[in-house]
Amino acid sequence: MDLMEYQAKELFAKHDVPVTLGIVAHTPDEAQAAAEQLGVVVVKAQVKAGGRGKAGGVKLAKTPEEARTHAEAILGMEIKGLRVNRVLIAPAASIEEEYYFSFLLDRANRRYLCIASVEGGVEIEEVAKTNPDAVRQIPIDPGAGVDEAKAREIVADAKFPEALTEQAVQTVLALWKVFVEEDATLVEVNPLARLAGDKLEALDGKVSLDENAEFRHEEHASFVIREEEDPLESAAKDKGLNYVKLDGSVGIIGNGAGLVMSTLDVVAYAGEKHGGVKPANFLDIGGGANAQVMADGLHVILGDEQVKAVFVNVFGGITACDEVANGIVGALDILGEDATKPLVIRLDGNNADEGRRILTEAAHPLVTMVDTMDGAADKAAELANA
């Protein structure tokens, strides 16, 4: 779960990261009132996307009236397809230098990684291109974590100014607490700023929380803003489905994350010869492919206007293919007139022959059965491009 800046800063404050919270405003009036309290402010769009400044979503306001004007312009704008419904009114800071700092999960190497740079305030990818030596990558042993000695190593490696060493060490330790104690997969500060008087402060923040650890953090539910979530992802979550919306036109249903990921790949490959068709989603129904689960999955996918065809790819294991086939037939009966797009079904594994027989006898006009994964992907891409 990605957090907005103001939410990330709340976690920073909780763990003693130096930060000023500011005031969240939903209307121009609220923005003006906040600026009257804070003085010179920065009006910052709150969306889960980068590039807010380039998009015109971050503006300096020297008066409350100017804050109101900026809020009027920013509220309702779209940044990378996301509508801005709130702004953060943050006190303007006198910045002397800007640094970059992050902890993240390095999945490829099965470890944590710290990235730090004394050239912050801009996209770290750009710094890595123009001055790679300024971007330091420090691996973190998951067993050892970050203690004071490791924090000092990080600060020294990143070449933070000597005058800021002690503050930087304490800030690194505090950010590590955010990362570990909140079960985050990313904690990023850009910029971590040196203010007048050699004071360090996190002026912006980005945090991604591991949704698999939600059971340990009931308090994280307060970060969920339902009206800002993708409606299809919200509907899938309510039904207990593992769904991620993508930008293609072939809906994907499979049992098992590995199989679904492979299905995305073969559909993308097949789509290259069918007008650039791509997968529309990731949807893993797991092992319980009964009629209701299939109906729930199909209902979510068919609710995506971009979907032109659906590829159901199932390998029967614990859940036999005849159960899956009965689930598909039952799902189509449940959906009735809501089922309007062609389905390509590929069954393999336990009781696959019986599953195919059930679907053949049902003879639903929307269903096409294909024996191979590549063939089914090609057919689904063809139908989506028809």
Curated annotation (Swiss-Prot):
It is an enzyme of class 6 (ligase). SUPFAM superfamilies: Glutathione synthetase ATP-binding domain-like, Succinyl-CoA synthetase domains. Keywords: ATP-binding, Ligase, Magnesium, Metal-binding, Nucleotide-binding, Tricarboxylic acid cycle. It holds the Pfam family Ligase_CoA. One of its GO terms (molecular function) is ATP binding. The keyword Metal-binding applies. Binds 1 Mg(2+) ion per subunit. It catalyses: succinate + ATP + CoA = succinyl-CoA + ADP + phosphate; GTP + succinate + CoA = succinyl-CoA + GDP + phosphate. Pathway: Carbohydrate metabolism; tricarboxylic acid cycle; succinate from succinyl-CoA (ligase route): step 1/1. One of its GO terms (cellular component) is succinate-CoA ligase complex. Substrate binds at residues 255, 317-319. Its cofactor is Mg(2+). The keyword Nuclease does not apply. Residues 9-235 form the ATP-grasp domain. Its EC number is 6.2.1.5. One of its GO terms (biological process) is succinyl-CoA metabolic process. Mg(2+) binds at residues 190, 204. ATP binds at residues 44, 51-53, 93, 98. HAMAP family: Succ_CoA_beta. Belongs to the succinate/malate CoA ligase beta subunit family. Succinyl-CoA synthetase functions in the citric acid cycle (TCA), coupling the hydrolysis of succinyl-CoA to the synthesis of either ATP or GTP and thus represents the only step of substrate-level phosphorylation in the TCA. The beta subunit provides nucleotide specificity of the enzyme and binds the substrate succinate, while the binding sites for coenzyme A and phosphate are found in the alpha subunit. Heterotetramer of two alpha and two beta subunits. This is Succinate--CoA ligase [ADP-forming] subunit beta. It comes from Nocardioides sp. (strain ATCC BAA-499 / JS614). The gene is sucC.
